[in-house]
């Protein structure tokens, strides 16, 4: 680290003729002229370093092979037990699209005290496209039964000692608890099956010490495949059987993790009553990085018995699963917050990140060279890799890379005899230094070794912003900005001078031919006739649906997904049902024009909260870039410069515009219902609405708290609601709107009462709607029935029906999905129209 933190030095920096700024790692900034420079140094850079999110590799949980079938591929081998037996099972099954497997281990305490929230959590997972496989425990219940029978409850290293008398009681208790979960799921409308035996094959672990406790040697997945085929949630008890048919007890944590090794689920969730894993002070640990913390944790005096067993099994499991796999420990009522909120309240256990230098025994030269090609765009052996290999062996240059080979660097001595190294080049898997936090782990590795310095063109705003976050000091100038780490203050002056004198990169000296095209030009050339779009505010429920629809679009490519909360993380951490290597960027108002240019963006989806998007739009208005903008907030629904994005009634105007104000969710239903009768109203119509709690967003609040909403609805903002003002403005006629939140997850129902100028019959009303929305595939007119929320949930359509007429009094019931036609579907319709594409591309396949 920098020493002499209170000492100031002055230096003359040549070739920089304008006012410069210097920043130290205590965040103080000193202005200085080109002839006199004051550089302050100190400590604190490590407080800026965030934990790295691992690169997500493709997970083989469900692979679609046709519209009506899929293949579930389980791992071909497992490890972690002494007697390892090959496990191989593959079966083609009929399965719904978007289904991804999540392994859920449920503690016995949850079954006993919080089964209602538990069932809500499992149903929530299914709602967002994740299919749970449940493994349950029953420790508290078994202990109670043993006490009643006069049997002692004994444990050795966290494992229950199981003599024949205990095993007999355990089988009865586990069956009872299994059926509790199954029956509760069935009562909630979710199909479930008990799987009490037949999944685990085992041998006795140590009969003299543990009795009838098993060591899992094989996983049988026939029962699981059968359940998934028929859309049943399998509920598995932690009992195994020997090849000869002897029943053995398996610790539920061990059972769940052994199953995870074999099926490689998209996510692993441990649901317990403590909402996480607690440390010695009784506080929940938010993150555990096993590669970094395991050895120290196992030495802690509070790590014993069950906790010690958990950590041991967590490591055994994560060591054999893809590096991106994590285990989330939370409670039923906090599951949604843990999955979606910025500050989850449970514990996330990850394998962590290991860094390699080119001198490390595990350094993979081939993978590192592939990373260079991926990052620099070199093809056909233009870089002389044999020369690079030789120079690495001689120490002419040094290489550092993360264990997933998604981020790396080349460094070389700043000058002969210098203790400071010059960072010659950065390499990133997806060609964007700003779109990954892997670079932070690379720098952490650098900090452990020596002092480093590098420079960047002052014009490269995106890179400079990133480097400022990870450097202990920097100076900015008209031509170049200089960044450094861990340089003593008495060496900074000379180091800066020597850094400025570096004229070319190492790779440029061993490259046979270089492309003259810029990165953005090459990107535009390689677009393959797909329009490139970006999504700002890419998190939560609406963002997930937009990402999914874009992912399945034949003519669109999601080039950027921006989220300040998730910056650098794989997009699958927010939307686990997707299969994508994309990582979150952090697009800001001051750099959206640069992102637009450098990434060849044809259109932006702005999924930001109200009153946030304007600075982004102002930057684009002041630049030469003119992408299509579809804003899902309410910011521009009252702005005449923007086009109201209601395709069924405003298609021609949308086609000629690049600024689209996407209608609100409730507003879509009210507008479409009232539009055919807007000229026939005597008084303002009254609109009573109930929305699912997903409409309150993924940030926890009373309006999306399932406990508060249980057997309840919550009215809110009953006058002057934004959607009331929006629809009144767009119709040119006032309305009244009374919104409520219900206990269901997604969907909207509206009951709208209108007083007309003249009497009408039901037949006349139905005919009016049918003519008005003829040839509109997303508008359904139900002339005889009453639309229900559950019938329209998960669909792209609006259903108008429930017609009740009494003279000139008309009541209409309308339903729609607030996340789809009320948000993502309509936004995609608008983007398709603006780009000249099929309006229903990526939508019609799901109708």
UniProtKB/Swiss-Prot annotation:
Q: Which keywords does the record carry?
A: Amino-acid biosynthesis, Arginine biosynthesis, ATP-binding, Kinase, Mitochondrion, Multifunctional enzyme, NADP, Nucleotide-binding, Oxidoreductase, Transferase, Transit peptide
Q: Where in the cell is it found?
A: Mitochondrion
CDD domains (alphabetical):
AAK_NAGK-fArgBP, AGPR_C_ARG5_6_like, AGPR_N_ARG5_6_like
Any one Gene Ontology BP term: L-arginine biosynthetic process
Q: Where is this region: N-acetyl-gamma-glutamyl-phosphate reductase?
A: 531-846
EC number(s) reported in the record: 1.2.1.38, 2.7.2.8
Q: Give the record's pathway.
A: Amino-acid biosynthesis; L-arginine biosynthesis; N(2)-acetyl-L-ornithine from L-glutamate: step 2/4; Amino-acid biosynthesis; L-arginine biosynthesis; N(2)-acetyl-L-ornithine from L-glutamate: step 3/4
Q: Tell me the active site.
A: 665
PANTHER family, sorted: N-ACETYLGLUTAMATE SYNTHASE, N-ACETYLGLUTAMATE SYNTHASE, MITOCHONDRIAL
Query: What is this protein's name?
Result: Bifunctional protein argC, mitochondrial
What is the species listed in this Swiss-Prot or TrEMBL entry? Dictyostelium discoideum
